[in-house]
């Protein structure tokens, strides 16, 4: 006799408390002894089991479980995590079903019909003897001479099935004209990657084109679905649509305009000339509509059609094209909708036109509810606040968004955290509240983690490392950078198709922004300052979990072939300056060399050698042509051996700032000389070589005419050494960038930090030569003035710190004509003059600082005359 016992216990699966019932079935005595017969087993199976009534479960049965002890927040987080998992699982199932549907359709065989046909064949073959007395039949059991009326063979079933599937995507008329069901199914079955280009091209080859198809059918099955057309196929579609309306433009419908505009606006701009062709085509369509209006068309222009125009103009960053489409709204009497306003808003933000951006945003707020800003619009203006480092306005926008009922998502909180991090960079932008802003930024990060769990986006990681970097939290910054690089490397390698190209892999993995924040953390490190996250419990837990999740030794990374070892010191916390300098140099080289795939020290003589240089000389008519040819060779050299995405002035300046902040003058000078070169130095070497080469070529020609027997030896002797020197110099520039205004400003700051008059003098002289170069002269006038003003201010600050007040005052006096000196710029100089009681110099300085502009003088004169 079987005996059942039941008990209930709590089982935690995927964060849900689930009642789990277990059934305990004791073995029979015979089974335990092992001496049972087959009859005993048969009797056991045939014996009717006694049913036991199972009562329903109520909350009273759970007395042994204290549910109140469950953390409510943790339970809510687990529920949200389970919902997110369910959502992702549904998406995966949907994608899998789409792929399965594609495979089944591409087989062009209806399995159900095939089974029916196979059953028919089997029945005919098995009854072969019975069918002998009937009239002659073929091998499928189908009477010869009457096959179409009696049954359907396998080929007709396949064709019928593919025809039925093709008619799901196109009108039956078009399917018949195409006469290629396989093409239709191949191009349109996968709805996520439909390719309409072969379809439109094939339809255009038919004389009938789109004629004979009802308007409703045309709109629902073709015009509303066709997407991703190339420009030539858009032209074909437009031509067929004109033929469809018998070239009567008054019958050209709204759906036709919308389909053409949508495909035009989504064209990928691989060729610069293509953008002009697209704009011309859009204007041509609008001119066609204007002409149709004059003729009395009933077709209505819509906001959605014109939105494609402003979207494409926004993509081009072209103000003239944008204004053209905006005036069309007024011309047609169309009020822009929310989508139109948002597109224009994003365009102005991208172009850096802050005033117009805020005007558009305010207009959206004070129009109807249909025009009220949505989440996209709010996120767009928050990026504008980030650019302006205006954290107070960003907080106002965020609170306004919450009060209007819009739920700020992960992207919004990420932007807010980034804004607060950037605003905390110094006491001026943070208004003396740097730590408070970072603390508020971490609050947004905690909200993101509570919502999404441990799965953080790239933008969220960037905001986190920005907060840690400005706080000088090296331990957190290193861990975040390590997590980002290793995770992205694994994802890229796992999805890589074909033979692995590690240069391309690392180019997509290494992010210069993340590297810049890591270097910023190194430069802001202060051993006497406690990281902000260690000041409260939630921050301590977050920091500990992230740092402990990283294995700097790399042992856990090589469980498979996807592991990568970054050049970090095998410690969780760095405490010494020399460790920061060594690790920053290693990370910098690792990024420049594509993770070790290339080498800074390798020579690329195949790109630059003697013959290459002489060819450049012979092909250059002027010195400028020769410079251009050499620059192109340097660019080619860099692109093949160095990660040029990382080698830029922003990251390099942050890299150079590290030894300045850590008081290591020798390391700064080494880094400066190793990774920068001077424009005037490059010009002098190139010009002297070019002139010398031309002179030698002339001399060689003269010697060839006088003594041809010795001309060859002389030519080799003269051309050897200069070529070698220039080739080595060019090769040394492959990992260097041209020193610019910010480089000289940083050098002057270093001179002030190290109290080095020689370094300051060199920076002053080098920048004086740089001002005469073409690189500086090509800058806009306001940029040149801004750079001159900043460098002069740094010079005054340096001389004042060295108590060289006469030199500092001389800088102010010599530049007063083109620099508008303000008191904060010369405050230290004024204080120094007060200490030595130099009243004459004080009067001169204050006279320059307090002088009025010509406009102010004229205005005061006019006001005095009026009085």
Curated annotation (Swiss-Prot):
Its main location: mitochondrion. GO terms for biological process: mitochondrial genome maintenance; mitochondrial RNA processing; mRNA processing; positive regulation of rRNA processing; RNA splicing; rRNA metabolic process. Keywords: Mitochondrion, mRNA processing, mRNA splicing, Repeat, Transit peptide. It comes from the Eukaryota. Pfam families: PPR_2. Residues 1-96 form a transit peptide. PPR repeats lie at residues 337-371, 374-408. GO terms for cellular component: mitochondrion. GO terms for molecular function: rRNA binding. Coiled coil: none annotated. InterPro entries: Pentatricopeptide_rpt (IPR002885), TPR-like_helical_dom_sf (IPR011990). It is found in: Mitochondrion. Regulates mitochondrial small subunit maturation by controlling 15S rRNA 5'-end processing. Localizes to the 5' precursor of the 15S rRNA in a position that is subsequently occupied by mS47 in the mature yeast mtSSU. Uses structure and sequence-specific RNA recognition, binding to a single-stranded region of the precursor and specifically recognizing bases -6 to -1. The exchange of Ccm1 for mS47 is coupled to the irreversible removal of precursor rRNA that is accompanied by conformational changes of the mitoribosomal proteins uS5m and mS26. PANTHER family: PENTATRICOPEPTIDE REPEAT-CONTAINING PROTEIN GUN1, CHLOROPLASTIC (PTHR47936:SF1), PPR_LONG DOMAIN-CONTAINING PROTEIN (PTHR47936). Binds to mitochondrial small subunit 15S rRNA. Belongs to the CCM1 family. Involved in mitochondrial-nuclear incompatibility, a major determinant in reproductive isolation between species, through hybrid incompatibility of Ccm1 and its interacting partner 15S rRNA between yeast species. This is Mitochondrial 15S rRNA processing factor CCM1. It comes from Vanderwaltozyma polyspora (strain ATCC 22028 / DSM 70294 / BCRC 21397 / CBS 2163 / NBRC 10782 / NRRL Y-8283 / UCD 57-17).
